[in-house]
Structures are given as structure tokens and as C-alpha cells.
Amino acid sequence: MIKKYKLMSILAISFSFITCGQKTDHQQLQSKTQLSKKQQTMDVSKITDPAVKQAIEALQAGDKRWYGFFTENPVMTDDGNTVDFKSFFSNALGKESFLSIDRVENNGQALYGKFNAGKWGTFPVFFKFHKNPEGKFDRLDIGQAR
């Protein structure tokens, strides 16, 4: 009888240690929500070009409105290499975002800041937006800021 009691006590304590170390679904969702709110509320007040500001707000939110700020087939470079805009952002939108905007140049169309690039890590970047005469972006140059 005492052996059964000891065994049951050991099992109960073991299970309590296991369950205490796990996050509940609610805790995991809360963590993700806090990160999402942080991304969406990053300070964009330094961005002086209204279209760039709105585009960055869409990027931060992982919102497909991002695509609407660009022409049908914008030119895009990543560290000087031409890449397909739609393909690039089909993988990045909602997974990558600015952590801070540190510097703005070229009438609000060139941004420099800290960027979380998902699996690639966090590093300083630039985003340079180029507008066509109709006000849509027809080119985006991004890359690591030096």
C-alpha cells in the first residue's frame, strides 16, 4: 500500500512539472498577438511621403493592400540583384517587418532602419521607393544598409 502511494505521488509530481512548463494555446496566441501589435504600431511618423507611410503600414500589418501601392510589375532589387516583386513578397508579407525606422531621405521615399527578415534574422536595411507619374511605385530597391 505504501509503495502504491509513493508511486502515485511520484507520478503526480512528475506530471505537474511537465504541465507547468508548457504554454497553453491561449498563452501562445497572446504572445503572437503582442508581437503582431508591436509590428503594427511601430513608429512611422518619420516617414514624410504619405504613400510610402501607407505602404509601410500595410507591410507591417502583413496586409495585401501592400500590393496596391505598386504598378502591375514593379522592378525590384535586393542588394542590387533583380528579383521578382510578387514572388518575393508572397514569401515575406506577414513574416517580415521593420522593427524601427531610423532615418528617412529623398523626400520620404528612402527608409533606413532595423528589419526582422524572419529566418534570415534582424539587420539594418534600406527600402527605396520610386514613383511613376501616376503616383504608384514602379520600383523598389531594398538591401542591407552599410
Question: Each PLM stretch: what is its role?
Answer:
Residues 20-61:
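Short, low-complexity N-terminal intrinsically disordered segments enriched in polar/charged residues
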Residues 70-71, 78, 117, 132:
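Acidic surface patches and DE-rich sequence motifs
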Residues 51, 61-77:
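Short, well-ordered alpha-helical segments enriched in acidic and aromatic residues
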Residues 1-31:
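Bacterial Sec-dependent N-terminal signal peptides
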Residues 86-130:
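Surface-exposed, charged secondary-structure patches
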Residues 76, 103-106, 142:
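Hydrophobic/anchoring residues in structured secondary elements
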Residues 122-146:
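Short beta-strand edge/turn micro-motifs at domain boundaries
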Residues 72-79, 84, 94-95:
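Mature extracytoplasmic domains of secretory-pathway proteins
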